[in-house]
Amino acid sequence: MRSHYCTDLSKADIGKEVILCGWANTYRDHGGVVFIDLRDVSGLIQLVCDPADSKEAHDVAAKVRDEYVLKAKGKVRARGEGLTNPKLKTGEIEVIVSELIIENPSEPLPFMIGDESVNEDIRLKYRFLDLRSERLQNIFKMRSRAAIAARNSLDKMGFIEFETPVLTRATPEGARDYLVPSRVYPGQFYALPQSPQLFKQLLMCSGFDKYFQIAKCFRDEDLRADRQPEFTQIDIEMSFVEQEDIINMAETMLKDIFKACGHDIKTPFRRMSYKEATETYGSDKPDLRYDLKMIDVIDIFERSSNEIFSSIAKDKKKNRIKALKVPNGDNIFSKREMNRFEEFVRKFGAQGLGYFQMKEDGLKGPLCKFFEQSDLDEIVSRCELKVGDVVFFGAGKKKIVLDYMGRFRIFLAEQMGIIDQDRLEFLWVLDFPMFEQNDDGSYSAMHHPFTMPKNIDEPDLEDILSIAHDVVLNGFELGGGSIRIHKNDIQQKVFKLLGIDEAEQREKFGFLLDALTFGAPPHGGIAIGFDRLNMLVNKASSIRDVIAFPKTQRAQCPLTKAPSYASNEQLRELGLRIREKEQKA
């Protein structure tokens, strides 16, 4: 239908007759001459419909409105002096139209294309219109480049691409499964995979050495700005490798992906233990674009005359007292603002938030009366305080303190505007605990139960570490993986520590345990969140921006109105009956 894309044309094409197709981006009538900015997937070009050149084309142009689909035939010419548009790639040329066809009109638009002030639910309802915006068009072109770069990079390193089943069985991987009822086997269900974890391990047992796929995964979990019920990951597994091999491979691939997206990143990435990350930054995915760090001061507070502080400080294993220094904070935040910060941390379980201000004559603040001068001097020394600095303190249970002080660190950085939005700061977090304790006292695997432990014979479960690795970018977990358990006895021992008895092991994981007894090789891998990667590359505020047809935060699709009710006939075929939700008394 067309001879060129809009932005294929340049001054070198002046005088050529061309045929273009696209949408009417804008329409203007200047003194009887109609100007139309024609838009296609490549960009914009200006069409000129002058009755002096073609009355027929001009008559058609008079009927054109926003988003009409057009086919235009005409000659390329240079724009007149002073009429060029440096903002457009084709800003030095235009097309004098000799023939114009309206291929399809458009109803009046529910919103202007590219207007991001429109409610997101409305934009998602008309996602096919929203996707016409230049910003989203560029995002999905970038996403395609990233996928191609990932495939090319892994292909160069000898990986084989596979497709693993989407209809599988439920396995405990940390979130709720999406279940699919079987018509053939009434009362039985498939589960949509939370990841291809077990299948990729089985492929290593099959001798394929290097596996990858760009996999669709499903998790029925509460949604946030960076989560969706269905998502895509670059899934990778390798045989006969150690952790260092996986890290080197992942850095090579990420370097290739980011280069394809216009970013040169430096390797190797910085590395940090889980303990250092949580104790220093209050997070296992710290944002290192700014240098606010937490400092341990529990031993100093143990000597405090304040009984609350001193009692907290006595149990150094279960409790924490952390200082967070803000350079020049006394000149940035008013006393009223600093008092208001307490409201922020209380939302995350804090009992309070103390602070000192570093003045010319030493530390000042309501907490000073509880300390000897020598202890105040030690706080100044340990926190390396200078005049004008403020240091905040959080005290209480370890898990709660590290969490709210980590959140407070991010909050302060945002308030001070010290986050460099153009900086890409990668980090490997290593030496994760193998297990984490739940609120009911039971234990679950921090990553998943197929991760190889470093020291399985430690008597205290909380002291067992895993050979796991997360790659972090700007405070987001970009991906994670581990060396896997390849020996049946170790896998069974991990299951037992998690409270999974032999009968349940056989029922849920019998196929894996069997595979491990037939010469399973040492293996490991990683999965990179492809949606999240694209969110960060494109500086998008939500993962929904980088998914063509995303769900809302309520896990609904305004476009297709999914989820929807099944018909009675469908339910009968599946042997299902919907029970009314019981009302609470």
UniProtKB/Swiss-Prot annotation:
Its EC number is 6.1.1.23. Aspartyl-tRNA synthetase with relaxed tRNA specificity since it is able to aspartylate not only its cognate tRNA(Asp) but also tRNA(Asn). Reaction proceeds in two steps: L-aspartate is first activated by ATP to form Asp-AMP and then transferred to the acceptor end of tRNA(Asp/Asn). The keyword Cytoplasm applies. GO terms for molecular function: aspartate-tRNA ligase activity; aspartate-tRNA(Asn) ligase activity; ATP binding; nucleic acid binding. It comes from Campylobacter concisus (strain 13826). Gene3D superfamilies: Bira Bifunctional Protein, Domain 2, GAD-like domain, Nucleic acid-binding proteins. This is Aspartate--tRNA(Asp/Asn) ligase. ATP binds at R219, D220, E221, Q228, E477, G529, F530, D531, R532. NCBIfam families: aspS_bact, PRK00476.1. InterPro entries: Aa-tRNA-synt_II (IPR004364), aa-tRNA-synth_II (IPR006195), aa-tRNA-synth_II/BPL/LPL (IPR045864), Asp-tRNA-ligase_1 (IPR004524), Asp-tRNA-ligase_1_N (IPR047089), Asp/Asn-tRNA-synth_IIb (IPR002312), AspRS_core (IPR047090), GAD-like_sf (IPR004115). It is found in: Cytoplasm. Keywords: Aminoacyl-tRNA synthetase, ATP-binding, Cytoplasm, Ligase, Nucleotide-binding, Protein biosynthesis. CDD domains: AspRS_core, EcAspRS_like_N. It holds the Pfam family tRNA_anti-codon. L-aspartate binds at E173, R219, H447, R484. The keyword Electron transport does not apply. GO terms for cellular component: cytoplasm. One of its GO terms (biological process) is aspartyl-tRNA aminoacylation. PROSITE patterns: AA_TRNA_LIGASE_II. The record marks H30, G82 as: Important for tRNA non-discrimination. Residues 197-200 are annotated as: Aspartate.
